[in-house]
């Protein structure tokens, strides 16, 4: 494991990314704990902490500039309930392939006032009953969940389903019963990694953006490109035949 020191931060790659935001690349360092991010001097729009071994989403300094946090392929099981106090302008958060299990574990994200884009793909939490509706209910500012735009119909359904305190208490009750399962999951080292898109896939995504016919499709593809996801149905040209074939999920 590698400690996240000021020296590591200063020596790590930093650049303007595909959407012209200043990004700090801290991925793949086996970092176990978030610390010393004050050394960034709040100079970045995006911080990429993907492919590390972080267990708790906490210990951030006040970063007024940070808008995007990429922390997929880690071991996140807990989120600081006051996270929003330190990241007031965070609008995009990628928690793909972590170890969030129970619905109530995302409650702390409600403290982030401007959160609009969230990915929880490949967490066990997504398998829970009414997962999507619960997240929509708790995170009022959210516009896109798991790369799918939230519809007005879903907001209404979520509001209706969780209109009573009893409904939320039932969710918390189920969560308490599964605390032991959460611990066992957190100790399991066999969590598969999500494979990042290849150079060919990135080019195909960019081409798809250019050829898109709707604003919604452009937004979906841009988010996929930004967060390192491969959209379903992406067409990859075959250089040997000049034919194109859709990507399998």
From Swiss-Prot:
Its main location: nucleus. LRR repeats lie at residues 20-41, 43-64, 65-87, 89-110. Keywords: Leucine-rich repeat, Nucleus, Repeat, Ribonucleoprotein, RNA-binding. Residues 123-161 form the LRRCT domain. It is found in: Nucleus; Nucleus speckle. One of its GO terms (molecular function) is U2 snRNA binding. GO terms for cellular component: Cajal body; cytoplasm; nuclear speck; nucleolus; nucleoplasm; nucleus; ribonucleoprotein complex. It holds the Pfam family LRR_9. It comes from the Eukaryota. GO terms for biological process: mRNA splicing, via spliceosome. This protein is associated with sn-RNP U2. It helps the A' protein to bind stem loop IV of U2 snRNA. Belongs to the U2 small nuclear ribonucleoprotein A family. This is U2 small nuclear ribonucleoprotein A'. The gene is U2A'.
């Amino acid at each position: 494991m590698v400690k996240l020191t000021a020296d590591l931060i200063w020596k790590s790659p930093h650049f303007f990314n595909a959407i012209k935001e200043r990004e700090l690349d801290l991925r793949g360092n086996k970092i176990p704990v978030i610390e010393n991010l004050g050394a960034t001097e709040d100079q970045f729009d995006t911080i990429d902490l993907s492919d590390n071994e972080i267990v708790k989403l906490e210990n951030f300094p006040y970063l007024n500039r940070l808008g995007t946090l990429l922390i997929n392929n880690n071991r996140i099981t807990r989120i600081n309930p006051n996270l929003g106090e330190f990241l007031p302008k965070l609008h995009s958060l990628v928690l793909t392939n972590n170890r969030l299990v129970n619905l109530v574990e995302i409650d702390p994200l409600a403290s982030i006032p401007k959160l609009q884009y969230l990915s929880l793909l490949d967490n066990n939490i997504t398998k829970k009953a009414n997962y999507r509706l619960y997240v929509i209910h708790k995170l009022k500012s959210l516009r896109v969940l798991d790369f799918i735009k939230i519809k007005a119909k879903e907001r209404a359904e979520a509001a209706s389903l969780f209109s009573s305190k009893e409904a939320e208490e039932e969710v918390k009750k189920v969560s308490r019963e599964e605390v032991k399962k959460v611990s066992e999951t957190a100790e399991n080292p066999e969590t598969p990694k999500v494979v990042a898109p290849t150079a060919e896939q990135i080019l195909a995504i960019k081409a798809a953006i250019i050829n898109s016919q709707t604003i919604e499709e452009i937004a979906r593809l841009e988010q996929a490109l930004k967060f390192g996801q491969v959209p379903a149905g992406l067409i990859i040209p075959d250089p040997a035949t000049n034919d194109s074939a859709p990507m399998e999920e």
